[in-house]
Amino acid sequence: MYAEERGYGSFDNVIQAYEQIISQSLHLKRFEFDNGCFIEFLADSGTCETFSKGWISMIYWTSETDSMGSLTVDIGMDEGKCRTYRARGLLLCSKSITSISQNTEGRERILTVSHENGKLQITFVTIAKVSSEPELRNLGDLKFMEKFEKECRALDRKKHDDEHRKRSGKQKEKRKVEDIDKKKEDEKLKQEEKKRNDEDKRPDKKDEFDEPPKEKRQKSHHETKRNLEEQSHEDGIAPTSTTFVNGAVEGALSPCVSIDNHEDQQHDELDKRVYAQGTNREGLSNEDNYGNFQLNKSLEQLRARLVASSGEVVERSLSKLKERLDYVKDNLIKNVLECADVTVPSKCLSKTKHIEQKKQIVFSDCVRSVPVCEIKPFIDMRVFETETTQNARRVRQRTRTTVGSTDGAIGQQRVISGQNRGRARGRGRGRVPRRRNSNLNNLRTQNSAIVIDDSSETENFENAGSFNEDLLATTILETL
């Protein structure tokens, strides 16, 4: 007998999560650990593996006599790894140790689990039986040793084959899936290639902008030329060499016409290359192609003249447009300056007496403070010769009549006073006699009131005969 397979596991900081007694003979326990280590030996080689955090599940069954049973230990790690150990046979159980010994054909398996003081130990050993007990006495015999080694090698080979069979089965399944995916990709590529080949085999579609054949092109050219000549005869215009197909005359250019010289140069280079090779794109001979080339060249010359003449016309129109824009711009600037909002009062430039304004003159949305002395020169006195001036004239006429009547009365009074030479009646002693000028002044002041507006205050002029322009301007400002 010899130990064929060995496994030793040690786990730290083990805590029992729960224990479940399903029946009197079936028990379930679960443990959790922080870190652990497991060492395996197979023949003359071994491996060591460490874990960080995981769980251990232990299921064991006992018979009625507690002499037989089974034990299964499952180890799971957070990293996704797992291990399983199981055994069935004779049972040895205590408070902290559970051990089972399984005896099969030529092999004996022992599984032991011990849990004590926060540590859990797992031991798994497989012992192989090679020969019977009498044969063990002849271990010194060379033949027996050779036989023993052959049996050991056979067992190792068998185990290796089993493992290889398992790995190969997994690899075959994986390879099968890869082959299926590869076949799908190949079929897809073949379909795309077939579709591409079918499109290449189709006849090329002619572009809409390809030139028509030579016969049709010449026919259309002659027809258009004939129509233009007939139209020019009807209109009284002599046909010249500068008349184009579209009816335009040399020097005239529509503003929406754009000429791409670069594209024409590319076409010319292509025609020259094709002519040098012997045939053009439409399969024409060198002579026909040369005629087309000459025709295109003459058209290019005419186009160049057209561009040169149109440039002058455009420059003239642009200069006129620029002048008009400058004129409109100057007018706009003047209007804006006139309507600008000026908060600082303007200074008086007049040498006459300056009268400060009491209100601002408002013209639409523009506000500007204007002194009275600047308004006065622009006042047309004839405009204000309305009711106020008419009233003033009436007052003058009345005063003249009253003055005449008063002169007569005064003359009569002088005669009476000369005759009587006494104190005038109706006058107290010690009073100053009334004078003619005082009566006239009172009469003038009573009749010289000029009303500018119903809402404004009435103002009296000192002298109705003379027109005070400064006072009139101030009154107009207050009214406005």
UniProtKB/Swiss-Prot annotation:
| Designated name of the protein | Protein U79/U80
User: What else is on record for this protein?
Assistant: Isoform 1 belongs to the late class proteins. Isoform 2, Isoform 3 and Isoform 4 belong to the early class proteins.
* Chain's role: May be involved in DNA replication.
PTM summary: Not phosphorylated.
Q: Which UniProt keywords apply?
A: Host nucleus
Q: Where found in the cell?
A: Host nucleus
Family of the protein in this entry: Belongs to the herpesviridae U79/UL112 family.
Q: Which organism is it from?
A: Human herpesvirus 6B (HHV-6 variant B)
